[in-house]
């Protein structure tokens, strides 16, 4: 979408140009600038079993979350381009990390990753493209298998000279204090003098697609903390115009730096999982299994650095790869139906398995979902999650989300 379509932004640009000695016509200044972004409103309500003064009590909480993002991409010439993005977020304050639904804890603690209201320039980088190679320098998305939507300052390069194969490499030396990095807590800073986000991140990856087979191969190293590896192999088949089936398998491991592991008390881990999926006309379904475990059953570990990365996942709250204890294995099924000509999808997930030392505790999660796609720009999502655990720590969460993208 061209900047000309945004009257407010155009007015601001006009004001700035009016004060510049070398001002150029507004249409000339904005003709190669694209604008995109979104506005999102969330309401989340939680109820969980917590220990208060050595007694189990139901604790409830609810909060609103407002987030708005606007990105500007300017074409400098045939090779160079520049990107800047501003973001406003209200997330309700501190994020608490602790033992919950099989999650481990590197010593416990609360890390307030952001103020209640935050306005920042979350993206600002220069890019250069020549042939099938693009290099980007500055504040940008950390593009890797082990992260979801976090940002960092550094260098990212992408090449697609080989048909069907994309190669990537990154180096980041200033990582965003993202709330989904469960290991980014006060206890680690106290023990080592640094948060995990204060360490440099290096990564390489390969993504291939040769119909019907696709694959990914990734390695990332967080300096003096942990090395992460993941491989994925998948296949998708079109049986006919109305039926498609897919298969996907993944394996990964985490190898912690010895000094860091000894200081914090963490251990290496392994992950493997598979998923089968099918779409039949208006129906969709999937089934799969994931196993992620620390090498020492009494230790905590991780498979993903931020959120769930690109690992197979079902449900909403029970399965967590960013921080966990002991052995964890779950199987899952999902199903949904999209009502024709309405934009409405109704679905459900069921996850069942065990967690903890030697998988001592059984746990399950049921998720009910309703999505409504009003048009290409406006979407609504609602889901309810209920977790039942042998340990007696039952949790439920409700979320409503409205998102407008442009």
Regions found by a protein language model. Give the residues of each.
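Beta-barrel outer-membrane channel/assembly domains of diderm bacteria
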Residues: 2-139, 155-160, 211, 233-241, ...
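Glycine/serine-rich loop-strand microenvironments at binding/catalytic pocket rims
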Residues: 23-38, 42-50, 56-58, 204-219, ...
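Structural signature of outer-membrane beta-barrel domains
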Residues: 42-46, 89-93, 142-144, 172-177, ...
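Solvent-exposed loop segments that connect transmembrane elements
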Residues: 49-58, 98-112, 174-196, 254-265, ...
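Outer-membrane beta-barrel proteins
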Residues: 57-60, 140-150, 222, 252-254, ...
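Solvent-exposed loop/turn segments connecting transmembrane beta-strands
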Residues: 118, 142-154, 173-178, 196-200, ...
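Internal metal/ion-chelating core segments
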Residues: 159, 165-235
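Detector for outer-membrane/organellar transmembrane beta-barrel domains
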Residues: 209-212, 234-356
């Amino acid at each position: 979408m061209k900047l000309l379509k945004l009257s407010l932004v155009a007015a601001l640009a006009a004001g700035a140009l009016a004060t510049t000695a070398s001002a150029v016509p507004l249409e000339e200044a904005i003709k190669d600038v694209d604008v995109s972004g979104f506005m999102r409103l969330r309401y989340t309500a939680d109820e969980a079993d917590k220990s208060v003064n050595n007694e189990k009590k139901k604790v409830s909480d609810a909060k609103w979350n407002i987030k708005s993002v606007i990105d500007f991409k300017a074409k400098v010439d045939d090779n160079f381009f520049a990107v800047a993005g501003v973001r406003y977020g209200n997330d309700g304050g501190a994020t608490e990390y602790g033992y919950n639904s099989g999650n481990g804890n590197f010593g416990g603690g609360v890390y307030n990753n952001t103020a209640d209201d935050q306005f920042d320039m979350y993206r600002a980088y220069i890019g250069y493209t020549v042939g099938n190679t693009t290099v980007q320098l500055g504040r940008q998305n950390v593009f890797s298998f082990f992260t979801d939507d976090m940002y960092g300052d550094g260098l990212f390069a992408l090449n697609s000279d080989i048909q069907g194969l994309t190669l990537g490499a990154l180096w980041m030396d200033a990582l965003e204090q993202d709330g989904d990095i469960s290991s980014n807590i006060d206890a680690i800073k106290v023990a080592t003098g640094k948060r995990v986000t204060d360490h440099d991140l290096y990564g390489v990856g390969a993504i291939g697609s040769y119909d019907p087979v696709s694959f990914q191969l990734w390695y990332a190293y967080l300096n003096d903390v942990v090395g992460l590896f993941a491989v994925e192999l998948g296949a998708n088949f079109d049986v006919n115009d109305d039926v498609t089936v897919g298969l996907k398998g993944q394996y990964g491991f985490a190898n912690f730096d010895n000094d860091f592991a000894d200081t914090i008390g963490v251990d290496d881990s392994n992950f493997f999982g598979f998923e089968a999926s099918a779409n039949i006309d208006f129906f969709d379904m999937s089934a799969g299994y994931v196993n992620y475990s620390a090498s020492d059953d009494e230790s905590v570990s991780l498979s993903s650095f931020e959120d769930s990365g690109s690992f197979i996942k079902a449900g909403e709250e029970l399965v967590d790869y960013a921080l966990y204890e002991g052995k964890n294995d779950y199987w899952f099924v999902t199903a949904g139906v999209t009502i024709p000509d309405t934009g409405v999808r109704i679905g459900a997930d069921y996850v069942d398995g065990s967690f903890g030392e030697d998988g001592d505790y059984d746990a399950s999660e049921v998720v009910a979902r309703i999505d409504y796609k009003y048009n290409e720009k406006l979407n609504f999502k609602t889901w309810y999650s209920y977790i039942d655990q042998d340990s007696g720590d039952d949790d439920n969460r409700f979320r409503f989300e409205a998102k407008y993208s442009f």
